Amino acid sequence: MSILHATILTVFPEMFPGTLGHSLAGQALNKNIWSYDVINIRDFGLTKHKNIDDEAYGGGNGLIMRPDVLGSSIDHALALNPNAEMYYPSPRGRVFTQSFAKEMLKNKNLIFLCGRYEGIDERVIEEYNVKEISVGDYILSGGEIPTLTILDCLIRLLPGVLMNQNTLSSESFEEDGEFKGGLECSLYTRPEIWRDRAVPSVLLSGNHRLINEWKKEQSHMITKLRRPELLKDL
């Protein structure tokens, strides 16, 4: 049995596993560290045309995904994954962060409802206590790409996915990590000199105390310049 299971509701089932079938996530999928199933919302569509949307009450642009269609597809998903937490990628949602990812993993059974068109009927959110989640202040065509993004982040946190689990402690946004929730320092590798640009000499010194101090200073400087709001709790 896998550690994490995701049920994905979408009108484009062919988009999954997508990028999650490759690299670390793909290897973890093959090892059954995580698993998924996809439900095609259109299978629950109405009439011979499998309609899943309709015009908005009160007017406005765009079509709304119908609650009766979504309700039937969600009921099916819950039958497969009864104890799951349900998320709906939406620009109105709580912003997804590294700490939010860890919070999500307290429940290893997740359902992702991928919206399309103008959005979904609000009654669906109320009926199923759906949690809205945002990947940033911009608009995409649907919830599939945010779902792939969120799952990629979650999968990396699962035991056995990374060759060295300690890698997580030296990454950006890790509150208990090397950079205390700030951005990662600048990185360098061979060659020592490239196009007249040299690797900082401290990194070649072999003095681990000085190297660690340099990394922390770099992290603080970069965070202050690019994401100063991350420093408020540091």
Curated annotation (Swiss-Prot):
Reactions it catalyzes: guanosine(37) in tRNA + S-adenosyl-L-methionine = N(1)-methylguanosine(37) in tRNA + S-adenosyl-L-homocysteine + H(+)
Keywords per UniProt: Cytoplasm, Methyltransferase, S-adenosyl-L-methionine, Transferase, tRNA processing
Pfam families linked: tRNA_m1G_MT
UniProt: S-adenosyl-L-methionine binding residues: 115, 135-140
Subcellular location: Cytoplasm
Main location (coarse class): cytoplasm
Enzyme class (EC, first level): transferase
Presence of keyword Phosphoprotein: no
Any single GO BP term: tRNA N1-guanine methylation
Enzyme Commission number: 2.1.1.228
GO molecular function: tRNA (guanine(37)-N1)-methyltransferase activity
Cellular component terms (Gene Ontology): cytosol
Function: Specifically methylates guanosine-37 in various tRNAs.
Quaternary context: Homodimer.
Family to which this protein belongs: Belongs to the RNA methyltransferase TrmD family.
Official protein name in the record: tRNA (guanine-N(1)-)-methyltransferase
